Amino acid sequence: MTNNIKTITLNLGPQHPATHGVLRLILEMDGEVVNNTDPHIGLLHRGTEKLIEHKTYLQAIPYFDRLDYVSPMCQEHAFALAVESLLKCEVPRRAQFIRVLFSELTRILNHTLNIGSQALDIGATTPLLWLFEEREKIMEFYERVSGSRMHSNYFRPGGVAEDLPDGLLEDIDKFIEQFHPKLQDVESLLNENRLWKQRLVDIGVVLQQEAMEWGFSGPMLRGSGIAWDLRKSNPYDVYDEIDFEVPIGKNGDCYDRYLVRILEMYESIKIIKQCIEKMPKGAVKTNDPKLTPPTRAKMKESMEAMIHHFKLYTEGYEVPAGETYKAVEAPKGEFGVYLYSIGNNQPYRCRIKTPGFAHLQGLNFMSKGHLMADVITIIATLDIVFGEIDR
């Protein structure tokens, strides 16, 4: 006599706090064990790539803030680099240092949210409260430099929108001095915590070969022991002048990926310190009048400057025909922008490569054979945001 073993089909999300957005999972369960995971995406699709085709190059920048809304400036960075590549324009050194400085602040902004929310999913509330206090300070720096806490719209092809306000560099320096011990406090709470290790060690293991085959990048790739970081392998702006290490894991499990993110924040502190020390004086925008608007003082004196300013912001500037792909090491992995121009003031095609899209595809093989509670841990370690996955 044979027993017919029935599997249970379970719907998780999209309105579930642990799915980190609008993720819907169809789980095939054998009791408590997961047999199959089928992610349903597209619930936050806004047609960003198509919308960008109907905007000028300047008007397209805010769309990048709204993809991975946890780390907006890194995505603006990729778009700015792509447009600069087609324009073949020089970026002032001060602007390059400012962009690297804020990219690293953005990395801390992302990782603090990821570690805090991952701890909360597992049942530890303290790290979230400690880390959100630090995130608030970084968001204040965002606000001081761009006027906005989240959707900054700060990076520009050819530099940045505005120079740093007085006293900001000193305040960032003070922040990183006190952030270092705060990060050590979080480590002391989690690193050797018995419950934390039970929930993360040997969960969601990704071997080196699997990580490469699935197209993983960022901490998901480095957690498996592959030292691939675009800031080292394909440096952009002034990363080649800055001294930092690339942290890697050994086992490719959730615990190693957590440690990689912690160590990356220490490296970000080192990079920010070097940016503050080496920050040169000078312009923050290219001096090409086709890209940079005239100053307020000039507009008060000259009608031509007024017309130039108006036309620059209504019609934009023309970008030479051609195609390019530029990628940055965003906090979640490789964020790339493929730009195709036909020589007018709007992108003909803007293809966006997001790291979370590749990582979510690996959820099925990572969670197979684990308990349902472990699926929540794996979703947290993927560090997914649906703004960038659904686009």
Curated annotation (Swiss-Prot):
Its EC number is 7.1.1.-. Gene3D superfamilies: Cytochrome-c3 Hydrogenase, chain B. It is a peripheral membrane protein. GO terms for molecular function: NAD binding; NADH:ubiquinone reductase (non-electrogenic) activity; quinone binding. NDH-1 is composed of 14 different subunits. Subunits NuoB, C, D, E, F, and G constitute the peripheral sector of the complex. NDH-1 shuttles electrons from NADH, via FMN and iron-sulfur (Fe-S) centers, to quinones in the respiratory chain. The immediate electron acceptor for the enzyme in this species is believed to be ubiquinone. Couples the redox reaction to proton translocation (for every two electrons transferred, four hydrogen ions are translocated across the cytoplasmic membrane), and thus conserves the redox energy in a proton gradient. This is NADH-quinone oxidoreductase subunit D. The lineage of its organism: Bacteria, Pseudomonadati, Pseudomonadota, Alphaproteobacteria, Rickettsiales.
